[in-house]
Amino acid sequence: MYHRHLLVEQTDPELFAAIEAENARQEQHIELIASENYASPAVMWAQGTQLTNKYAEGYPGKRYYGGCEHVDVAEQLAIDRVKKLFGAEAANVQPHCGASANEAVFLAFLKPGDTIMGMSLAEGGHLTHGMSLNMSGKWFNAVSYGLDADEVIDYEAMEKKAHATRPRLIIAGASAYSLHIDFARFAQVAKDVGAIFMVDMAHYAGLIAAGLYPNPVPHADVVTSTTHKSLRGPRGGIILMRAAHEKAIHSAIFPGLQGGPLMHVIAAKAVAFQEALQPGFRLYQEQVLKNAKVLAQTLAARGLRIVSGGTQSHMMLVDLRAKGITGKEAEAVLGAAHMTINKNAIPNDPEKPMVTSGVRIGTPAMTTRGFKEEQARSTAELIADLLDKPRDAANIAAVRAKVDALTARFPVYG
């Protein structure tokens, strides 16, 4: 028998120390990684329930194990809520992550050697959209589209390449693109060449749910996403699809790619979707956009170039070359000053992928902890102050002290 009061603190002090240290880091640092956020206590509680004990291969009402009547309720709640949130005809909430969701789409519609077309990783795409080292680039003939001279998606070139290569699948979506994506135009091109149209909305899902970024669901055959990032849920994936594709997608997830779903995570997804359906979620996403705009404008005023000329979303790419520092070094020195960020390639980057000439900045996490325009502006000024003298130990210490004072006023978990 287990005693409920016997927790990690008593049973595994080494691990507990690491968890406590991470808790302290999250509270003390300004989180600027665009793909990270803070899940609510309710989401984390659901993920820590006894649902983790239950095997439930299959789908609600059609399981290969007994005793699934209660986890069926949890999964059906998640399905119904995510369909309502995005206006989808059908949904699968079982993917363990965004990459698994994308792989399921490939399994449902493609054969090895088929041609797929996605955004170039070097110009803002994602590795699961055809990168040569990824399964998507190894198993399929991957062709890519990119940006024009203004660092906007080159829709004309994309259309020409689609007609020239006749891909079986066209993917829209990105991991480092700050502007709106014209999903209707992609859909028309896919229709013209007879391709399945897939959208990976992982980065933009929270904004889309709030009606503040174009919704791909009316245009795409299939839409994939993560459930964390701007959605503020647990780490996991979802697939939204037209009703006509429901059977193919469900079969691709189980038994195609996965066995037992993570029912505790699915329960946490249901909580997150319910939170996103509340009026306060739109207010949160509106503030995410306001903070991103102020942050980008302030950095630009301090001499840093924002790729694509600005942002229409929660994130931005910052070109660091004017400061004579690489993304790798900037990530390290900003981290030393308690600002967590990630290095990121910029379009036509002369540096290696693990070095880069830029960083990617996002505002979802800072907004969750209560930052508004004033704090976003202060954060941008602190970033610029540090990058003006990135190798000055006294400057790093001074910026770190200001960061610590700022985060102390805005705890993540009160």
UniProtKB/Swiss-Prot annotation:
GO-annotated biological processes: glycine biosynthetic process from serine; tetrahydrofolate interconversion
Site for Plays an important role in substrate specificity, residues: H228
GO molecular function, one term: glycine hydroxymethyltransferase activity
Top-level taxon of the source organism: Bacteria
Keywords: Amino-acid biosynthesis, Cytoplasm, One-carbon metabolism, Pyridoxal phosphate, Transferase
Cell compartments where the protein resides: Cytoplasm
EC number: 2.1.2.1
A GO-annotated cellular component: cytosol
Pathway, per record: One-carbon metabolism; tetrahydrofolate interconversion; Amino-acid biosynthesis; glycine biosynthesis; glycine from L-serine: step 1/1
Cofactor(s) this protein cannot do without: pyridoxal 5'-phosphate
Pfam families per record: SHMT
Modified residues (N6-(pyridoxal phosphate)lysine): K229
Catalytic activity: (6R)-5,10-methylene-5,6,7,8-tetrahydrofolate + glycine + H2O = (6S)-5,6,7,8-tetrahydrofolate + L-serine
CDD domains: SHMT
Binding residue positions for (6S)-5,6,7,8-tetrahydrofolate: L121, G125, H126, L127
PANTHER family on file: SERINE HYDROXYMETHYLTRANSFERASE
Biological role: Catalyzes the reversible interconversion of serine and glycine with tetrahydrofolate (THF) serving as the one-carbon carrier. This reaction serves as the major source of one-carbon groups required for the biosynthesis of purines, thymidylate, methionine, and other important biomolecules. Also exhibits THF-independent aldolase activity toward beta-hydroxyamino acids, producing glycine and aldehydes, via a retro-aldol mechanism.
Assigned protein family: Belongs to the SHMT family.
The protein's assembly and partners: Homodimer.
Name of the featured protein: Serine hydroxymethyltransferase
Organism of derivation: Verminephrobacter eiseniae (strain EF01-2)
